[in-house]
Amino acid sequence: MARVLLAEPNRLVCRFIAGILTDFGHDVTACEDCTEAAARLTIGPIDVLVTDMVLRDGEGSTFCKHCVTRGIRTITLSGHEFRDAQAEQDCPPPLVEKPFRLDDLQDVVDAVAAAAGSTRAAA
């Protein structure tokens, strides 16, 4: 199980993705903008950031870079098509394009969480 910080500006999409990640077994903290997400970082450790490319009060890519400097693994979601070079410049991989398959999201989050060393065997 990973401690996931989810930053998604659309309230319904945020709740949906948070529910999915919780069903996958992760401990999810959800927020809708950069300010709230930054505040959540001060509360406790986060293993994985899952953020939309564009948030209400800033760019998810900028917040993503901030998290990377803190050693937090990141996953960026986007409803826009990006060229590979543009996506890599704007945010570290992986980039998951919306709409996505639930299994694909689970695979990416699990892989990033494992790389962060936060997963553990099911009891």
Residue spans for each PLM region:
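C-terminal output helix
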Residues: 100-117, 121-122
